[in-house]
A protein has these predicted regions:
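Structural signal for beta-propeller blades
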Residues: 78-80, 122-123, 138, 184-187, ...
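Bacterial Sec-dependent N-terminal signal peptides
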Residues: 2-5, 25-51
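Short loop/turn segments immediately following the C-termini of beta-strands
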Residues: 75, 118-120, 181-183, 228-229, ...
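A short beta-strand motif characteristic of beta-propeller blades
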Residues: 45-52, 88-94, 147-158, 195-207, ...
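Beta-rich, blade/repeat-based domains predominating
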Residues: 53-67, 75, 96-121, 155-176, ...
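Asp-box/WD-like beta-propeller blade repeats and closely related beta-sheet repeat scaffolds
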Residues: 129-173
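Short loop/turn segments that connect beta-strands within beta-propeller blades
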Residues: 83-88, 142-147, 189-194, 237-242, ...
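Short, conserved, GDST-rich strand-edge loop motifs in beta-rich repeat architectures
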Residues: 116-133, 318-326
Length: 333
């Protein structure tokens, strides 16, 4: 199509020099503005990204604002990869010790990507009798190169217990807190890589099911963590973890998985077995909470959720362990 400042007539058009230049400039501005609008439309954030990766079964997700990409884990293959808005998947990191990568935490200010490593038997290539339901580890990577910089064995702290390292929170000092879904434990790995048992209490047990799952750090100095089996949400003070308490809630959070602290008073909870993302609100520093909204995911085995562009939230749909695809979907309440 011809720009509007060019005539479609067959004969020559003679314009005064000044008028001609002005018309040319106006036409170019209009043309460039049109291009700019097209570019903005192209760059718009998609509401859903479907990724054609067979049997990847991603469990954890983070959004890398600096590089404009999602980072996902894999229960069935162990490797960590990135996803662009055009659905392109690229492997970022892998190591033979990564039987199943579960929760992720992108600690951007310290240039670290933290991954919880476990073995529940779904990676048939790497699972062994010595790791099955016994492996709990924290792997730390350079998020730019994918290089593994540290691997911390957490299960060795309680070798007689079953283990499943699940999710990770990082506090303001760089300490990492990792939930164990098969034992009633929260581990702590300090910035120097030293691992300890931060909290161990039978109340945190999931019995024959999954116990603690999602975990987030609250800037007022405590952790919020959810138990999958019964949906209990716990508040755990960093200074006195044994003084942890259940958060009183009128909303059932049974099946609670990933958490996202959207702001100090708003927590998003992915309840996979309920096919729902709940928006929970608190006005008393998480002594109590109530639901202020929900988002229906459908039967997609939703696991966890991440922040993008400050306030947007995207939930991960792994579907099944053998699915030919997975999806990342914007949550709208």
């Amino acid at each position: 199509m011809l720009p509007s400042f060019l005539s479609a007539r067959t004969g020559p058009v003679v314009l005064p020099r000044v008028a001609g230049v002005a018309a040319l400039a106006m036409g170019l501005l209009g043309f460039l503005a049109s291009c700019s609008k097209d570019d903005e439309t192209t760059a718009a954030t998609p509401s859903k990204i479907t990724v054609p990766q067979r049997a990847l079964s991603p469990e954890g997700i983070q959004y890398d604002e600096t590089n404009k990409r999602f980072i996902v884990s894999s229960r069935t293959q162990g490797r960590i990869g990135t996803v662009r808005d055009d659905s392109t998947y690229t492997q970022l990191a892998d190591d033979p010790r990564l039987v199943s990568t579960i929760g992720l935490n992108l600690d951007a200010s310290r240039q670290r990507l933290l991954a919880a490593v476990s073995d529940i038997g779904v990676n048939t290539t790497r699972s062994t009798a010595t790791t099955l339901r016994k492996l709990a580890a924290l792997a730390i990577f350079n998020p730019s190169s994918g290089a593994l910089t540290s691997y911390v064995d957490l299960g060795a702290l309680r070798p007689a217990l079953p283990h499943f390292a699940n999710d990770i929170a990082v506090d303001a000092q760089g300490n990492a807190y990792i939930t164990d879904s098969l034992s009633p434990i929260i581990y702590k790995v300090d910035a120097a890589g030293v691992a300890t048992v931060f909290l161990e209490n039978s109340q945190l047990s999931g019995g024959t099911g999954f116990g603690l799952n999602g975990i987030v750090y609250h800037p007022d100095g405590y952790l919020l963590t959810a138990k999958t089996s019964d949906g209990t949400l716990y508040k755990v003070p960093l200074a006195t973890p044994t003084a942890f308490a259940a958060v009183t809630s009128s909303q059932s959070l049974v099946g609670a998985d990933g958490l996202l602290l959207l702001d100090n008073n708003t927590l998003l909870v992915v309840a996979g077995s309920q096919n729902t993302v709940f928006r929970m609100a608190s006005t008393d520093a998480w002594t109590t909470t109530r639901s202020s909204g929900s988002f229906a995911t459908g039967a997609v085995s939703a696991t966890t959720i991440t922040r993008r562009n400050g306030s947007d939230a995207f939930v991960l749909y792994p579907y099944t362990a053998t699915s030919p695809r997975f999806a990342i979907t914007k949550v709208v309440f």
